[in-house]
């Protein structure tokens, strides 16, 4: 919808204004419809909107980190925790990051969504309840405790 296209433009404009480098995309697709080009951007300033708000669009922001602890600290410092995506060939890092990143889901070496039969939901300020699996149904139910003496 037009609000998401406007939001994507705001994210990119803000990032570029704050010194980020636009590598690919960064605009409405052919100025028609409500499609945003897949966008790749690097050198994101920590004060940029895309570091404090959920993007929900085809923007991939690339970051450089000083070491492993810096990666975990920055990932977990965000107010949101819907999903996290990790790409590494190291099985040790795969396991360690999956455990240490605070998010509703962590995908390793894939950008595909979670499996539909497995409950999935965000944490922190991301998402409401769960989707997928029996826990998704439970999130729409209210339990009632009745005591009769």
Q: PLM features: what roles do these ranges have?
A:
Residues 19-28:
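Short secondary-structure junctions
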Residues 12:
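Acidic-enriched catalytic cores of C-N bond-cleaving enzymes acting on peptides and small amides
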Residues 1-9:
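Short beta-strand to alpha-helix junction loop
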Residues 28, 35-149:
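Conserved C-terminal structural/oligomerization subdomain of aldehyde/semialdehyde dehydrogenase
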């Amino acid at each position: 919808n037009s609000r998401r296209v406007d939001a994507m433009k705001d994210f990119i404009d803000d990032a570029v204004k704050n010194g980020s480098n636009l590598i690919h995309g960064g605009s409405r697709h052919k100025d028609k419809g409500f499609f945003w080009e897949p966008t790749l951007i690097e050198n994101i300033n920590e004060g940029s909107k895309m570091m404090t708000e959920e993007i929900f669009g085809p923007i991939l922001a690339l970051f450089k980190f000083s070491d492993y602890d810096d990666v975990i600290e920055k990932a977990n410092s965000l107010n949101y925790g819907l999903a996290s995506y990790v790409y590494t060939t190291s099985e040790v890092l795969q396991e360690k990051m999956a455990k240490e990143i605070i998010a509703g889901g962590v995908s390793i070496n894939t950008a595909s969504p979670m499996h539909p039969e497995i409950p999935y939901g965000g944490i922190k300020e991301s998402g409401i309840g769960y989707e997928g699996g029996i826990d998704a149904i439970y999130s729409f139910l209210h339990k009632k405790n009745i005591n009769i003496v």
